[in-house]
A protein has these predicted regions:
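Helix-biased detector of long, well-ordered alpha-helical tracts
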Residues: 1-289
């Protein structure tokens, strides 16, 4: 969210992550950091809250708090001491993060103008956030189905939910607009993008990078990877998508041109010879876990 001021503007974002894992704060921190950085040079301040039902064990809450604080420090964030809140209204444990950037100056990359004909670039592999969160919550069950090596490969992608590097590259590479994929997955993000741009779009499903690990875990739980949480994936709108994707790949970030904005209202997904239209965003597939 952006607020105009006499000195520029203020960018403020909030994200919430639910779950039983002590890692849940990482996802909320990554989501807010990425969102702010797509509109500002840096995050100036972060606020972290751990909320839980009255009966939640104290040790678990302090573990969640400690992990969130450690993650924020690792990524160079300034934050107030995380707060723990127990409440009767809380249905489960969650971490809420607010992040703020003050006095943001307008530059070429944050004028946020989109038009038909521009390319859509997608960074990294879709659904990795959701894949990691399923692993966090269902590790024992997954261990009976998949090898330890397979699960370790998933773990190695834990830092991919943070997008500082590719956002920095895009700012120098002619990007017009950046939007995080996030909750609801790539289908929801594309729908929101087209509505915001007041254009249509056409994208190639086969061009969207997805890890085999995500596909197999989604098949096991009968989930759609294209509707799975994707914090860390950034949609980038620019005039020359191939040049931007090349610049990102040179910085060791997976990137692909997946489509373009069009001068109508159709939101089209091509899958070989098949064509379908993007529906209104559905609930994130994580809700089924």
């Amino acid at each position: 969210m952006k607020f105009e001021t006499e000195h520029g503007c203020v960018v403020s974002e909030m994200a919430t992550a639910y779950g039983n894992s002590k890692q849940i704060g990482r996802y909320a921190i990554a989501a807010t950091m990425n969102e702010v950085l797509t509109r500002a040079e840096r995050v100036d301040q972060m606020e972290i809250r751990v909320c839980a039902p009255l009966e939640e064990k104290k040790k678990h809450l302090y573990d969640v708090k400690a992990e969130a604080a450690r993650c924020a420090r690792e990524h160079g964030q300034t934050f107030w001491e995380p707060e723990i809140i127990r409440a009767a209204w809380a249905a489960g444990t969650f971490v809420q993060v607010n992040a703020l950037a003050a006095e943001v100056k307008q530059q070429a990359w944050n004028k946020e103008t989109m038009r038909a004909g521009q390319d859509i670039v997608l960074t990294k592999w879709i659904g990795l956030e959701g894949t990691l969160r399923i692993l966090d919550e269902k590790r024992s069950e997954l261990g009976k189905r998949f090898s330890g090596t397979f699960l370790h490969q998933v773990e190695e992608f834990r830092e991919t939910i943070f997008a500082e590097r590719e956002i920095r590259v895009a700012k120098a590479g002619g990007v017009s607009v950046m939007r995080q994929v996030g909750e609801g997955g790539i289908f929801a993000a594309l729908y929101r993008l087209a509505k915001e741009a007041d254009t249509g779009l056409v994208v190639d499903l086969k061009a969207m990078p997805v890890r085999q690990e995500t596909i197999e875990i989604c098949e096991y739980y009968k989930l759609n990877p294209y509707q799975l949480a994707s914090t860390g994936n950034i949609l980038m709108i620019c005039d020359d998508g191939e040049a931007l994707a090349d610049a990102l790949r040179k910085e060791e970030t997976e990137a692909a041109v997946i489509g373009r904005l069009t001068d109508n209202n159709d939101k089209i997904i091509q899958n070989g010879e098949d064509i379908r239209y993007i529906d209104r965003p559905a609930p994130d597939e994580l809700m089924k876990i």
